[in-house]
């Protein structure tokens, strides 16, 4: 059975780390579903111009919870997130964005985001 107690904590924790150690790079990893819990914190990172890089795993939903439904042979309910554009949301908060669709694109995208300074989302598009 999966556990979802930590949904949404990546971005707020990254903001705290960036405030505590501004000289160090901060990289947060989040799924698209969990990120939606605290998406408004993007404004905090922008206001403080924190060099946070958010790597967003975009599978258009709550994949672990979706799998729990499947494992229990139960109908899926409330686990698919398909009505948002994460990059448009991030840009609306003043973040730079980039998209990764192939494994070989990830390392260069993260390196470029870290080098750019300021808040940046690297969206990894994966099958739902």
Features from the language model and the residues they span:
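Thiamine diphosphate
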Residues: 1-128
């Amino acid at each position: 059975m999966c556990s979802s107690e930590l949904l949404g904590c990546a971005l707020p924790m990254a903001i705290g780390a960036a405030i505590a150690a501004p000289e160090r790079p901060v990289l947060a990893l989040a799924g698209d579903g969990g990120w939606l819990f605290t998406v408004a914190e993007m404004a905090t990172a922008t206001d403080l111009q924190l060099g946070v890089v958010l790597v967003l795993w975009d599978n258009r939903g709550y994949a672990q919870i979706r799998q729990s439904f499947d494992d229990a042979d139960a109908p899926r309910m409330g686990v698919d997130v398909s009505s948002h554009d994460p990059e448009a949301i991030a840009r609306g908060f003043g973040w730079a964005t980039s998209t990764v669709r192939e494994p070989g694109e990830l390392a260069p995208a993260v390196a470029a985001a870290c080098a750019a300074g300021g808040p940046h989302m690297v969206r990894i598009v994966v099958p739902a």
